[in-house]
């Protein structure tokens, strides 16, 4: 509950977009900043794309159901087994990576941009689960007892995620009433197009976690980075929040 009348909100540390999403459900126009391009993409997709999808619900759902069928019955991945992936191949079993890349190819071939973005988010949402990695605070290699064989079933997890998204579009997309607007990756450099009534945020956690490195699999999958060498460049744009984060980086605005 917001105790004042609010028509516009700014979220300087967007994260996964909780504040803009709730604002949009109340019909409040929101603006946000987020240094992680993958997280910014997720936020825009689950608000703006889902809102737009509600206007052409049947078409979007039909496309997603067709994609689901192609992934389950017609996925051509054998020729991708053993491909190099700019050093990221070490994080996956060879067949898992081949299937991820085959599904990504199907997604990129979709002609409908809303369905394409929704499907990208669906694929990115399973990438850690089907990899050799696990998130326990930070992203790290999973120990032998931390993964089950079914965790590596790419087609199962992707199609299950599509089912969840199709349900949400069918029954909940009308709850998203207002768009959100990405203004700048860095909150310190953001220029808002108008005065806002309210700033609501969950500031960066003081825990030393590197949220760029934590999403490196998603960043790579959706082509926000090519190699791990680009991660420090993205990370340097963030606000240092934790003693373990302090480094000798230069020329970082305060």
Task: Locate predicted features.
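Class I S-adenosyl-L-methionine-dependent methyltransferase catalytic core
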Residues: 1-11, 18-201, 205-254
């Amino acid at each position: 509950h917001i105790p004042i009348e609010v028509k516009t909100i700014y979220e300087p540390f967007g994260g996964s977009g909780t504040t803009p999403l709730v604002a949009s459900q109340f019909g409040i126009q929101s603006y946000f900043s987020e240094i992680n391009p993958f997280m910014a993409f997720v936020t825009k997709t689950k608000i703006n794309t889902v809102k737009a999808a509600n206007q052409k619900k049947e078409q979007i759902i039909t496309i997603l159901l067709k994609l689901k069928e192609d992934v389950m019955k017609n996925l051509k991945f054998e020729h991708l087994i053993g491909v190099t992936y700019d050093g990221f191949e070490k994080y996956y079993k060879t067949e898992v990576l081949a299937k991820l890349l085959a599904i990504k190819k199907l997604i990129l071939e979709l002609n409908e941009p809303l369905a394409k973005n929704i499907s990208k988010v669906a694929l990115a949402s399973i990438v850690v689960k089907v990899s050799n990695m696990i998130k326990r605070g930070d992203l790290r290699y999973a120990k032998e007892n931390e993964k089950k064989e079914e965790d590596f079933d790419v087609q199962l997890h992707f199609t299950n995620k599509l089912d969840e998204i199709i349900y949400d579009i069918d029954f909940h997309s009308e709850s998203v009433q207002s768009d959100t607007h990405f203004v700048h990756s860095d909150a310190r450099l953001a220029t808002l197009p108008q005065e806002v009534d309210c700033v609501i945020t969950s500031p960066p956690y003081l825990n030393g976690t590197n949220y760029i490195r934590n999403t490196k699999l998603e960043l790579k999958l959706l082509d926000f980075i090519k190699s791990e060498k680009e991660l420090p460049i993205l990370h340097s744009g963030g606000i240092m929040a934790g003693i373990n984060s302090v480094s000798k980086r230069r020329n970082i605005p305060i």
